[in-house]
């Protein structure tokens, strides 16, 4: 068993292309250099449209710890509209980091779950 490192969670969730989707309004990372190398305890303030008028968007601060907690939650109970592929990738983060391979879609699902509390866009 090898759990994902902070660098790996950053790479899989922030670097997989999900933030290119139009509903991601703002991304403010800290603890990461210009090359994407984690330099300490990283965080990312993310703002996502909600799909509703009020409020039109939500903001949350994501970190390695938040991602790992969300991965465990998804493993325990698959959120509505979440793919089984995303659930499997969450299991890899927790138990077999070398096998983790998030793409834009699966990382977007987990990011929406963490920021919005549900998966709205897909």
Q: Which residues does each predicted region cover?
A:
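Long, contiguous N-terminal structural blocks used for assembly/anchoring
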Residues: 1-57
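Short amphipathic alpha-helical segments that mediate assembly, nucleic-acid/protein binding
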Residues: 6, 86-87, 107
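Generic detection of short hydrophobic beta-strand segments and adjacent strand-loop junctions
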Residues: 60-62
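Long, low-complexity intrinsically disordered regions enriched in Ser/Thr/Pro/Gly
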Residues: 64-82
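Long acidic/polar interaction regions in large eukaryotic complex-forming proteins
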Residues: 89-91
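Acidic, proline/glycine-rich low-complexity IDRs
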Residues: 96, 101-121
């Amino acid at each position: 068993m090898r759990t994902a490192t902070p660098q790996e969670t950053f790479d899989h969730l922030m670097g997989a292309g999900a933030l290119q989707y139009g509903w991601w309004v703002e991304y403010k990372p800290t603890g990461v250099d210009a090359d994407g190398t984690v330099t300490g305890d990283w965080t990312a303030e993310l703002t996502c449209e909600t799909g509703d008028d009020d409020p039109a968007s939500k903001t949350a601060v994501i970190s390695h710890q938040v991602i790992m907690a969300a991965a465990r939650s998804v493993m325990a109970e698959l959120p509505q509209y979440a793919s089984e592929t995303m659930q499997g990738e969450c299991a890899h983060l927790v138990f077999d980091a070398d096998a983790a391979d998030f793409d834009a879609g699966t990382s977007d699902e987990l990011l929406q779950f963490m920021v919005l509390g549900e998966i709205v866009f897909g």
